[in-house]
Amino acid sequence: MRVEERLLKYVSYWTTSDEECRQIPSSERQFELGKVLEQELRDLGLEKVTLTDHCYVYGLLPATKGYADKPAVGFISHMDTAPDFSGKDVKPQIIPDYDGNDVLLKGSGAYLKISDFPTLKTLKGRTLITTDGTTLLGADDKAGVSEIMTAVEQIITEKIPHGDIWIGFTPDEEVGSGADLFDLDYFKAKFAYTVDGDYEGEVAYENFNAASASFEITGVNVHPGEAKDIMINAALVGCEIASLLPENETPAHTEGREGFYHLTDFSGDIAHAKVNYIVRDHDKATFEKRLDTLRGIEKKMNEKYHADTVKLNIQHSYSNMLEVIEKNEYVVAIAKKAIKNVGLEPVSRPVRGGTDGARLSFMGLLCPNLGTGGYGFHGPFEHISVEGMDTAVSVIKEIVKITAE
């Protein structure tokens, strides 16, 4: 099966994760794709194939005879799609020989614009896959899943010699818990790669430090005609909290290694309000200062109004894997060599996000991130080219060849 056929098949499954649910998987629907992948791995002849009760899929392609002493390598992608935008009833648009112009997304009437996504120019002449504008595409990370599955199939059919190859597909990466129950006692790779990036030829090993922060605000509600010096409007306190953070330190005003505070949602009324943020920074010390800023706001609000008006809850999400990877640079060197072998110059940028690999690297499994060839993730402008996916398949195969040398 061709890589694009797999992608179109996998995106037909609704696998949006649920950031409000603390169990794994956060949405039972992720099992539908998990069962499909489990069966496909079995059909390809892999061993130790399992779908766990928590929706992790594992499989082993055993080493070619005479190659059992070579390092075991793993490839990992996630099955869920981001809750930021609908992932239900995805209707991809397939555009052969893309002309390099803006693309009409026929379901919504919106346009995928070159002015917003300049990399579109580089995809001219390729087969482009987009959304119809009413959902995200799900290339993040079903493109990665497709590329791994296709690479495994080609390694088998082309009889490429290899050491042990472990495959892992996770739930709930998009809500920060994809690595929580990843079984490293079962998945016995020496090192691995997530296939969850964007740029073709990308190998990323520096990501954000990340946390979520929630302000719970309890107001005092009385009749507005008798409210003087009594009422505390929780919704207005929430607005005040937002105003105390620097307005130029948001995702819309930052790039590269610049961190941010991101207001993800705000709900409430006079009696109760909730303000949710995610906090990101590549530098660990600066990241901790950001969290201290939030704690300072909590203290200030409780001093201004009364104790327990505001309660802040901070949850750590993941750390910058650079801290671990820079001590084990061989995993990046292998990926860069593989990328050069397919005719590309490796791209390594600080990832303005996180991957399962960031968590796994701190758990003992070194795990940089490879590009899938997709762009515009988490929304209706998500797109990918067939040729970009083919390149990712080739990179995976080259990594396998290099580790078997």
Feature-to-residue mapping (PLM):
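A non-catalytic alpha/beta surface segment that caps or lines the substrate-entry region
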Residues: 22-70, 74-76, 80, 91
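Flexible, glycine/charged-enriched surface loops at secondary-structure junctions
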Residues: 19-20, 48, 161-164, 247-262, ...
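Midchain, well-structured core segments that form catalytic/ion-binding scaffolds
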Residues: 126-139, 171-295, 299, 308-310, ...
